[in-house]
């Protein structure tokens, strides 16, 4: 089996590509089930945010799994596979573990250190768990990633290096408007991103908020929450956008809808002050033509991506990265140690069978042996065998936790002629430093999977069946 991460993010793809591939909440279950219907995918969950779309999967073969994931994403986005893979990356084995831990820690975010991604991973896993597309491998991986993210935020000050994309967008709006205190804001969308934006607006001292949402009850619920916190707020239907925009100084959009929600027809640019749009949707909620209107400024994910692409983490990011590296080593060591357990179990089973056979032989040779004597002999033989096996079985578990340690389990199976099916161990290609090798662009990986082209991508792990 192979652990794969296949995806796109702000690091590898422009917003125009990301918004085509973005998977809305109402589509996520369908995409997950389509992945599981493919020939090589055994488990899967998908993280789709404003900055990334990533599939975490357990596949029977590396290249088969890669082809399955890329074809599903291409079909979903309506893109050609070759065009899409130019912007995609793949991590496998330990590198996939390291990537997810880094994402959970906020180290791979557009705004380094933002904590929102933790909730997004938790929600993504929850959807997959409910859909029945995750098994033991991804369950353990996702839960450990969430623990790593929490530890990083608890033990470092990485939060101070970046709150969220929302805070960065509102900081730009504050600059354009000369401050947000007392201003009027229209919030389009009342989902998780909308809730985060509402909280940021409240902290910025916004004067009043109107919430427009497709589902009226959700918009009213968010408005009530703001009113409870002392911010005047009300909710309107989406068909009231034009009048609400004419009233607002700031419009924050985060609907997750497919296609533009705000067009030039919604915006009046007559005798009024500056109007700022913070478009946090993926795909974008605001039509590109809106940015060309006089007096209008649009801050969107593409704007933030350009500005933050050169952002470098400070000392807290380095501390966070050290924690991630430590956690990756620990996780991989634990996985390798767990993988040798079937071999140890098979060895002890073989020893017990030998003891039982010898005791039966003793019974046939000495049928008159008294019961208490026979029982003491049996206990003695079993104690001797247990003591002989104790040191090597403990040691093999310790050695198995080191890079390349699976070879010790192989040696045990060979020496004691253990059934490889009974003592199956899933191998993972490891680098000398304990981190599994395994990252490349999807284009490189797909070329490496083509006949006659395997040498183009070095260090690919051995695969099952025809992919070996």
From Swiss-Prot:
E.C. code: 1.2.1.70
Pathway in which the depicted protein is active: Porphyrin-containing compound metabolism; protoporphyrin-IX biosynthesis; 5-aminolevulinate from L-glutamyl-tRNA(Glu): step 1/2
Binding site for NADP(+): 189-194
Region ranges (Disordered): 428-468
Transmembrane helix as UniProt keyword: no
Keyword NADP attached: yes
InterPro entries named in the record: 4pyrrol_synth_GluRdtase, 4pyrrol_synth_GluRdtase_dimer, 4pyrrol_synth_GluRdtase_N, GluRdtase_CS, GluRdtase_dimer_dom_sf, GluRdtase_N_sf, NAD(P)-bd_dom_sf, Shikm_DH/Glu-tRNA_Rdtase
Keywords of the record: NADP, Oxidoreductase, Porphyrin biosynthesis
MF GO annotations: glutamyl-tRNA reductase activity; NADP binding
Superkingdom of origin: Bacteria
General remark: During catalysis, the active site Cys acts as a nucleophile attacking the alpha-carbonyl group of tRNA-bound glutamate with the formation of a thioester intermediate between enzyme and glutamate, and the concomitant release of tRNA(Glu). The thioester intermediate is finally reduced by direct hydride transfer from NADPH, to form the product GSA.
Homology family: Belongs to the glutamyl-tRNA reductase family.
Its biological purpose: Catalyzes the NADPH-dependent reduction of glutamyl-tRNA(Glu) to glutamate 1-semialdehyde (GSA).
Subunit and interaction comment: Homodimer.
This protein's name: Glutamyl-tRNA reductase
